[in-house]
């Protein structure tokens, strides 16, 4: 069985073209009962994604396609602690967009699964992430033989993904136009790393098998990994930090003091 573990929505600004209702319709049309939302560098659409999944009886998986100026990995949430760490990972990346992904994940890799296709970063990550939580990603545009070689060298399992950005090939030109606008470039001057090819559309299981005919184990691994991911989510109760200050005036003074300390720490001056 195949599960889409790398899908981008309109909440990947200037990249993704799929609305959340469209994602639900595509998953149901392919008889898929589990789906991951892995927008670029953010969880902006995740709560709405969970709501749509509940209405469509689809199991929602939280994730992020973490992209810096130098590196890229796919991160999926295993448990609640992993979700908290994913939030920390995203915040760290936005604090330093040129930072090293390995340095970030070294602090916050507990409770998440990491998939990558670049052998150099996978080697770094394998020094502190166990092979039970680190995988080689086979996505459109990569040769099966190349990914297999990386897998054998690092002794890591392969997981196939669709790296989805749009519904079908006819939407590729729109994706290209958005990327050109985002990069302040013409279509002809776009760098090949700035956009996706027309292969990054939402495929059915049969179409994924056709794409990767020699990697059935990697396709099945997507189901295996999805079963290990957190899919039960509750956003009903608002979570506030515990603060035992009965007097409202004292609470306001404490809040003002903490904000001032934090602002000075972050900005150096007020």
Model-derived regions: residue spans:
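Phosphodiester-processing cores and adjacent nucleic acid-binding clamps
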Residues: 1-270
